[in-house]
Amino acid sequence: METGRSRGGGAAVSERGGGARAGVCGRQEQAGALAADMDSHCECAAETPAAEPPSGKINKAAFKLFKKRKSGGTMPSIFGVKNKGDGKSSGPTGMVRSRTHDGLAEVLVLEGSKKEEPPGGSDHSGARPIPGPPKPSGPGLGSLASSSVAKSHSFFSLLKKNGRSETGKGDHAEASKAGGKQKRGLKGIFSSMRWHRRDKRGKEEEEKAVRAAGPGNLVLPGSLTASLECVKEEPPRAARRPDSPGQDASRHAAGEPAGGEQAPASAESAPERICLEAGSPTGSGDQSSRGEDAEGHRREEKPGAALESGAGEVQAAEDASKTGDVPIKTVPLVDSEGGSGRASAVPDPSSVDPPSDPSADRICLMFSDVTSLKSFDSLTGCGDIIADPEEEAGPSCDKHVPGPGKPVLSKKNASVVAYQGGGEEMASPDQVDDTYLPEFWDMLSQTEDQGQGTQEGAAKAATASDIKLAPETSSDTRCGEAAKDMSSVKRRRLHRIPIESQQKEEPKHPEKEHQEGVPNSDEGYWDSTTPGPEEESISNSSSSKKVVIPRDSDSGDALCDLYVEPEASPATLPATEDPPCLSRLKPVSPGTITCPLRTPGSLLKDSKIPISIKHLSNLPSSHPVVHQQPARSEVPRTKIPVSKVLVRRVSNRGLAGTTIRAAACHDSAKKL
């Protein structure tokens, strides 16, 4: 029935086509004439399918191709609007609706053929043999495969030719197509979409190779193909996420460069790939092989643009699919991770090394701060207190240990400048206590034994041991020897200090008056980190006074006697060897050490020890200074916070002899 109607309608159409085509020959490009021809076909086809009227409207704008293609899709109402707009706006180019680049090529070729066909009225007879293929395709349209064929490029061209020839065969194809449309449901639509893409691969990919770059693919397909692309692109995306990156690369490289249709083609296989993946763990390999096969077919079908635009990409995709891009992508990931790992690995050794270096650096800075304060009238009042008496005695100790002492002085002169004021706290002996007190006490025990055997052997150990064995007498003799040895250097620094020492000695008479103001003066010096030279000299005198009083109270009368004896000599002979001895004797007393060390506030922490042993606590904290230099040379990396406990032990040990020994050691350290 439908075929008879379509044939009858085809006869009527042919009759109309006789006159209409004659008039249309001149104005084929105009959408009105085409709409008239399409209306005739629409009437014939609209008799059977209820969905034909919207498709008929589309056909007016799209040369029946939209109608048939629309009939191929059971969603004419939805996409019909898009097709209507596209077809009407595009007119004869409405055929461009095909999402693929082939659609563009087909539009150009078909339009050219249209122009050629209508002028020759004999084209109808010539076109009739052409629709012969549509007949087999027509029954095929009834099935899902037929719908895909209808959407195929060749069938589109045949449909266009049939529509133009308006032969009964073309109408019959339309009728059969309409019947197929009615049979198809949503399942048929989706299946036709998938099949259409698969079939189109071979047919349209040839023209796609020519039209490799077609940004309007998605725009053109406003029909089911567009929706199919959208629908299928989404599942492939989901599939791409679980799929190996190799598959993604193969899809992008092989599918996209060739054209938008290849990607959908791969998208069609994507759902199957997903199923395969879910079914078997080797689904990824199967997918990659399929991608390769599809790509292989695509390559064969795409001799031109595929080789030009995506040959390298396709090869890369094949390699990716064969080798699996998982390792490839993972390789950059591994590289990035490896780089980060390398970076992390690098910081690890660097973090390990710097602590060791900073420990030595901190030691150097600590020595430099102490020595710089000693050798230089540091801007800090405390530094001034330490500096003047120790500058005199410092050179002798420096000569005994010129290697570590002098370079430290040179290094830390600059550092002292940076650490003026609070810098002293930075290099306070607390840090030294944390790191070197254990070693220092060990060194003290060793140096006592060694000092007895070799007082002059190991410079630092000898000086410390001599002072420890006989804090009073050895300090005098030691000062004399050091003064003789370093008379020249002493004189140089003595020239710097004689005036200051005299000033110190002069105000020493009213020492008792300054005794009460000692702590306040220390605080004042600490607060004013940069006193003027006059202030420095005054502070030196006051500091010497301060030193004298604690010596009397803490270290005993012997130290006071020693200290009182030098008072006369330095005033008389500042540049002679005696003043250095006196100055050295001064630092020997713990008072000199305690005053400057108290000010930094680091020793305040050590002041936890009972007041009677404050000097001991201060001295052990300063003792590490003595052995810090040798520690730098011997064991620069010693991080032992237990040193504070050792300081407490020292306080428990607290004996007058030990205090004097510690004072002597600290003096030697300051000299260094």
Swiss-Prot record:
Q: Name one GO molecular function term.
A: phosphatidylinositol-4,5-bisphosphate binding
Kindly state which keywords UniProt assigns to this record, in alphabetical order. Answer: Cell membrane, Lipid-binding, Membrane, Phosphoprotein, Wnt signaling pathway
GO cellular component terms given for this protein: plasma membrane
Stretches of Low complexity bias are at 142-158, 255-269, 343-354, 446-457
Instruction: Tell me which InterPro entries the record gives.
Output: AMER
Q: Segment Disordered: which positions?
A: 1-23, 74-360, 443-560
GO biological process, alphabetically ordered: ectoderm development; negative regulation of canonical Wnt signaling pathway; Wnt signaling pathway
Record's compositionally biased regions (Gly residues): 1-21
Q: What is its main location?
A: membrane
Name the family: Belongs to the Amer family.
- Origin organism is Mus musculus (Mouse)
Which lineage ranks, top first, belong to the organism behind this chain?
Eukaryota, Metazoa, Chordata, Craniata, Vertebrata
Its assembly, as annotated, is: Interacts with APC.
Q: What is its subcellular localisation?
A: Cell membrane
Put simply, this protein is called: APC membrane recruitment protein 2
The PTM Phosphoserine maps to 154, 223, 227, 244, 284, 356, 359
